[in-house]
């Protein structure tokens, strides 16, 4: 009987030590400086889904010499720049469509790949849209981070 208590005690001690010494690999949305930059709840949901899959987008990236910001920016190791936009109802209006068209043209001319996902598509099949986005990102050279000590450069 004493042996059982010794084994149980050692197991508990090793478990507690493992919890203390092992770095957490889980994403904590309440402790993320990029997440707070998301403009709305749907962007936060997309951001959370990407982070849970270990992708690190830059949120609200300010395009140099322009007045607009990108919902999510990714920079591939191969030099490709990727703009992921989450489009709400405004983007379906004639004014929004025209503005997005001009913006997309500018971005593509300046070396960016633009990916747009509508709120309708996300609301009708969120996980499917995230899986499609992840597949596109992988195809373009963006892969999940394998580093546990990932450092994000903050943009001013």
What annotation goes with each model-predicted range?
Residues 1-57, 144-156:
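Solvent-exposed, charged helical/coil patches
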Residues 40, 63, 98:
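Conserved phosphate-coordination/catalytic loops
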Residues 42-43, 68, 100:
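Amphipathic coiled-coil/heptad-repeat helices and related helical stalk/stem segments
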Residues 43, 60, 85:
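Acidic-residue sensor for enzyme active/binding pockets
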Residues 46, 74, 103-107:
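Hydrophobic side chains within alpha-helical segments
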Residues 79-139:
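Basic, amphipathic alpha-helical patches used to engage nucleic acids or provide basic targeting signals
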């Amino acid at each position: 009987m004493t042996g059982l208590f010794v084994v149980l005690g050692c197991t508990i001690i090793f478990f507690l030590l493992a919890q203390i010494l092992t770095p957490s690999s889980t994403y904590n949305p309440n402790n993320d400086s990029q997440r707070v930059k998301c403009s709305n709840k749907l962007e936060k949901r997309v951001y959370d889904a990407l982070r849970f899959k270990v992708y690190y987008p830059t949120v609200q990236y300010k395009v140099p010499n322009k007045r607009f910001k990108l919902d999510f920016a990714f920079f591939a190791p191969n030099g490709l720049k990727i703009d992921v936009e989450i489009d709400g109802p405004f983007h379906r209006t004639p004014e929004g469509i025209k503005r997005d068209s001009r913006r997309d043209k500018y971005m593509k001319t300046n070396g960016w790949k633009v990916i747009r996902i509508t709120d309708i598509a996300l609301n009708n099949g969120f996980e499917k849209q995230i899986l499609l986005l992840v597949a596109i990102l992988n195809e373009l050279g963006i892969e999940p981070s394998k580093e546990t000590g990932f450092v994000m450069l903050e943009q001013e």
